[in-house]
Amino acid sequence: MSFPADSVGLVTPQKFQFEEPLHLECGRVLPRFELMVETYGTLNADKSNAILICHALSGHHHAAGYHHEDDKKAGWWDSCIGPGKAIDTNKFFVVALNNIGGCSGSTGPTSPNPENDNRPYGPDFPLVTVRDWVKTQAMLSDRLGISVWYAVVGGSLGGMQALQWSVDYPDRLQKCVVIASAPKLSAQNIAFNEVARQSILSDPDFHHGRYLENDSYPKRGLILARMVGHITYLSEEAMKQKFGRDLKSGKFMYGFDVEFQVESYLRYQGEQFSRNFDANTYLIMTKALDYFDPSREYGHSLTEAMSKTKCQFLIVSFTTDWRFAPSRSQEIVDALITNHKPVSYLDIDAEQGHDSFLFPIPLYVKTLRAFLGGEEHLKSTSLEAS
């Protein structure tokens, strides 16, 4: 297969093993853990050009390129990562990973539990938080010999991780890019997550999370959970333009099977997702979203939480994103401005809703490229650091 000129091409994931115990916010300890990682580009001599990519709820380490010659689909953010793209791999060394609790190679519910005869953790896997993820990412940074990230970048739940980095490790990143995100979930967002979780928990095939041991899988519950989530990722206008009230067969069938194109789309998305994602992981990821609130330890003051940050910020929102509306990004911006922190903010007119952050929207790409800068900017920041 001939890959596009601006693709990173074939990539091979790497597994990093950490033998030291990981103490989690929930009070439990993972005796050891593994992280699945992909890297793109080349780390320069002084290790000043490294960018960390943090993934969203259903994301993973495969952010760009292809795993096989016959792959039809590239990594989840291939539109922005590659030679000459917004995150230019000719200039930057890009690191993407699958967080713990995930189901794409890092230690999670499907991994063997050393304290239970190496049976899958299943529901015994501890609940993890965004702070736990950032802690493991910092450990990965140490393993790679990267003391300071040039930038930490993320969209949605990934943006929350980037924001947590700026609070927990203010001396270890120069730039923070928070896209289509929020400083904490609203009651409405927590409600959406609870409906998704109940869809899984109430599936008879869930077996209290021990479905692998029972040779079953809560497919129906996971399909419903994804359908609910997908509705919130798209804007009303995007759904109107994509589907309208179009019928699959062109006429009413007067039944409960699929009739409207939007129904067909949601069922297809749910079906595809259920084949590739673990139900226990979905539960863990949504709880991590619910728990995220960096202001909680600062008297519930986001302004106070952001007071010790030292990096430059780019905050991006999208006009039709109603899952994490622009007003939520503006809360972050206001807290930074109050603290006299360097921040750039852009609310981009886009019709794709929350999923806009995954698309190569021209102004979005241009802004991201400009904020990250290029080789000349890397030289100047390296001189400043020395």
Curated annotation (Swiss-Prot):
Pathway: Amino-acid biosynthesis; L-methionine biosynthesis via de novo pathway; O-succinyl-L-homoserine from L-homoserine: step 1/1. Pfam families: Abhydrolase_1 (PF00561). Substrate binds at residues 226, 355. It is found in: Cytoplasm. One of its GO terms (molecular function) is homoserine O-succinyltransferase activity. The keyword Zinc does not apply. Its EC number is 2.3.1.46. Gene3D superfamilies: 1.10.1740.110, alpha/beta hydrolase. The record marks 323 as: Important for acyl-CoA specificity. GO terms for cellular component: cytoplasm. Transfers a succinyl group from succinyl-CoA to L-homoserine, forming succinyl-L-homoserine. This is Homoserine O-succinyltransferase. It comes from Acinetobacter baumannii (strain ATCC 17978 / DSM 105126 / CIP 53.77 / LMG 1025 / NCDC KC755 / 5377). The lineage of its organism: Bacteria, Pseudomonadati, Pseudomonadota, Gammaproteobacteria, Moraxellales. The gene is metXS.
